[in-house]
């Protein structure tokens, strides 16, 4: 059947982007467009629940915001999940964020989901599902301890 990891993103403990993993495969990622009218500092928590059936190691995560690399820190690593965190500063009205385990252009074009988050109007939308089944949870009700961003 193939590998299928689970990949979620929690933003500021308030918004959850769920099921960002591909239907099959060892890659995970997404493209985000965030619209805001003033400076914002957003805390991102990236949660990977690995499928160990065919792999020995979980791929790392790379994040770019408006073509600038974002420092990503691994904060927890267990058999059941791997958690990374990053802080992204929004300076522009529109911020494009790329999050990925593999930056192959074809994955962004046809496989990774594309999500729009309008922080002004609080409208959050999955623009393109591509080869995944993402959904947005807002407000977030953490149902696992590691989803809380205390």
From Swiss-Prot:
UniProt-listed Pfam families: Pox_C7_F8A (PF03287)
Native species: Variola virus (isolate Human/India/Ind3/1967) (VARV)
Induction (UniProt): Expressed in the early phase of the viral replicative cycle.
Function summary: Inhibits antiviral activity induced by type I interferons. Does not block signal transduction of IFN, but is important to counteract the host antiviral state induced by a pre-treatment with IFN.
InterPro entries membership: Poxvirus_C7/F8A
Family listed: Belongs to the orthopoxvirus OPG027 family.
Name the UniProt record assigns to this protein: Interferon antagonist OPG027
Domain of life per record: Viruses
Keywords associated with the record: Early protein, Host-virus interaction, Inhibition of host innate immune response by virus, Viral immunoevasion
A single GO BP: symbiont-mediated suppression of host innate immune response
